[in-house]
From Swiss-Prot:
This is Sugar transport protein MST6. Mediates active uptake of hexoses by sugar:proton symport. Can transport glucose, fructose, mannose, galactose, xylose and ribose. Expressed in leaf blades, leaf sheaths, anthers, ovaries and embryos. Expressed at low levels in roots and shoots. Residues 1-18, 103-119, 164-169, 226-291, 345-359, 410-428, 475-530 are cytoplasmic. It is found in: Cell membrane. It is a multi-pass membrane protein.
Length: 530
């Protein structure tokens, strides 16, 4: 690759091109893969708060709930059931396993076919859940939903990061998280409506309607173009060049094309990406692929979102009121995500992480204190509606803090930091860790709520402190940096630079590496530009 590196304010090459309608349409369609994940997060908590659903599949939980309401017994423990938590969390265990297979499909067949497979599998799972006659049928449907989520979550963030121009990658990639939040909101609204259906079969409608977002991504994937990166990696170089011209809206694509080809040639030297990802030079990316999804789940957000109706019911809301409160948090989630879309490529990833972490910590402390002051350790109390509404207000503020920080960035940053040779393997690790800890926390939340009481909110708050400090010291800024040049960011970081040798950097023939020591990990334009 000839020529030096011309660096813009974000620290990477500014390739010619613009945001074309073709790219915008492709990214919107691909981002709908987030709908299936979001819909499931929202729908599962809603149906588990519907009495007809509990009576049919989890009668012991229903009896415990009724006894708690009549006898003023411990509100913290009335939903504690291993079978109920297995219903919710089985999806995430299936998604964890599926993501490893999705890595191979995504690399060999292309990103779009991985999305298509995820949509079709999710569609079958939705049909099975809607027609469920027993718990086994219900959980089998959840497993198929999980396979669909594993494939979609593995392929969609990669697709968005590869299609988007570097300077707009954050905005377009966050479309995935936006679709997750829209899916959650739609599920909350549907639950609110189906709970009113007479005859007690509204839960079937809620579960079966998961087929709608599944059909959207399955059909939409058929019309999506492959990314230039994927085409080059699979040997279709002429098609890749034509596609790159189309997605960038210019004929001046030679420099970017040559960089993509060089990255692909480098990747083909790696015969075993799963083994190579353990090499010292990939230590920074591997650490982030594990730490970021781990921390994302330890914010406690999925606990709030898919147990929101159950949580609000525990706080004393009636059935309809608890579902409406979940709708309110869903609305906050959607609108706050737009804040991230607008600011992520201007303010950068680090600032949003740090601000969101501070906001979530404050809200966790307030919510835990309010619940503790009223319920104490006994879990027995009547909460006035005004008091409960005050709790919901701070939960909404917490959701907003997550929605413009750890929510979208937890998917964006891991998808943009891996070089092509280990990108699919790296994204699989990211998704697998995310699903593993979603499963663990979903499985553990109701028992933990029963045993830790209001202290549980302080538990998650402590993790928010840890993850915010981790970002402050160890996450470099990656805005505006082309994916193929991300190694420069790690090489220039005060800590991660020690893991990367000069010979591990293959960006340009005339690149002069900056000295490690920049805490933010930003590449100094004065040192990199010729």
């Amino acid at each position: 690759m000839a020529g030096g590196v011309v660096v813009n304010n974000g620290g990477g090459k500014d390739y010619p091109g613009k945001l074309t309608m073709f790219v915008l349409f492709a990214c919107i369609v691909a981002a709908t893969g987030g709908l299936i994940f979001g819909y499931d997060i929202g729908i599962s908590g809603g149906v588990t708060s519907m009495n007809p659903f509990l009576i049919k599949f989890f009668p012991s939980v229903y009896r415990k709930e009724q006894a708690a309401e009549k006898n003023q017994s411990n509100q913290y423990c009335k939903f504690d059931s291993p079978l109920l938590t297995m219903f919710t969390s089985s999806l995430y265990l299936a998604a964890l396993v599926a993501s490893f297979f999705a890595s191979t499909v995504t690399r060999v067949a292309g990103r779009k076919w991985s999305m298509f497979g995820g949509g079709v599998t999710f569609l079958v799972g939705a049909a099975l859940n809607g027609a469920a006659k027993n718990v086994l049928m219900l959980i089998l449907g959840r497993v198929l939903l999980g396979v669909g989520v594993g494939f979609a979550n593995q392929s969609v963030p990669l697709y968005l990061s590869e299609m988007a121009p570097a300077r707009l990658r954050g905005m377009l990639n966050i479309g995935f998280q936006l679709m997750i939040t829209i899916g959650i909101l739609c599920a909350n609204l549907i639950n609110y409506g189906t709970a009113k259906i007479k005859g007690g079969w509204g839960w079937r409608v809620s579960l079966a309607l998961a087929a709608v977002p599944a059909a959207i991504i399955a059909v939409g994937a058929l019309f999506l173009p492959d990314t230039p990166n994927s085409l080059i990696d699979r040997g279709h170089t002429d098609a890749a060049k034509r596609m790159l011209r189309r997605v960038r809206g210019t004929d001046d694509i030679e420099e970017e094309y040559n960089d993509l080809v060089a990255a692909s040639e480098e990747s083909k030297l790696v015969a075993h990406p799963w083994r190579n990802i353990l090499q010292r030079r990939y230590r920074p990316q591997l650490t982030m692929a594990i730490a970021i999804p781990l921390f994302q789940q330890l914010t406690g957000i999925n606990v709030i979102m898919f147990y929101a109706p159950v949580l609000f019911k525990t706080l004393g809301f009636a059935d309809d009121a608890s579902l409406m409160s979940a709708v309110i948090t869903g609305l906050v989630n959607v609108f706050a995500t737009f804040v991230s879309i607008v600011t992520v490529d201007r303010l950068g990833r680090r600032k949003l992480f740090l601000q969101g972490g501070t906001q979530m910590l404050a809200c966790q402390i307030v919510v835990g204190s309010l619940i503790g002051a009223k319920f104490g350790f006994s879990g027995v109390a009547d909460i006035p509606k005004a008091y409960a509404a005050f709790v919901v207000l701070f939960i909404c503020a917490y959701v907003a803090g997550f929605a413009w920080s750890w929510g979208p960035l937890g998917w964006l940053v891991p998808s943009e930091i891996f070089p092509l040779e280990i990108r699919s393997a790296g994204q699989s690790i990211n998704v697998s860790v995310n699903m593993l800890f979603t499963f663990i926390i979903a499985q553990a939340f109701l028992p933990m709520l029963c045993r830790f009481k209001f202290i549980l909110f302080f538990f998650f708050g402590a993790w928010v402190v840890i993850m915010t400090l981790f970002v402050a010291f160890f996450l470099p800024e990656t805005k505006n940096v082309p994916i193929e040049e991300m190694v420069l960011v790690w090489k220039s970081h005060w800590y991660w630079g020690r893991f990367i040798r000069d010979e591990d950097v293959h960006v340009g023939a005339d690149v002069e590496m900056p000295a490690a020591g920049n805490r933010n990990g930003k590449v100094d334009p004065a040192k990199l530009a010729n």
